[in-house]
């Protein structure tokens, strides 16, 4: 199983968090430079990447 690491904004800076692309249900834009990564109805993250960057990262990770 491939796990991709994304940069997540956190207090005091950014941190790498592992995201399994299989768990990602959808990605939505969140402003011009951020994306929301949704795992289910209750769990989602906002990350400092565009939606296009996130989708490309997940495609690479899923190979």
Give the location of each predicted region.
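Acidic, Ser/Thr- and proline-rich intrinsically disordered linker/docking segments
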Residues: 2-63
């Amino acid at each position: 199983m491939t796990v991709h690491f994304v940069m997540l904004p956190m207090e005091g800076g950014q941190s790498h968090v592992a995201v399994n692309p299989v768990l990602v249900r959808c990605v939505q834009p969140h402003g011009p430079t951020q994306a929301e990564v949704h795992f289910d109805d209750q769990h989602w993250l906002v990350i400092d990447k565009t939606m296009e960057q996130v989708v490309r990262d997940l495609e690479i990770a899923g190979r």
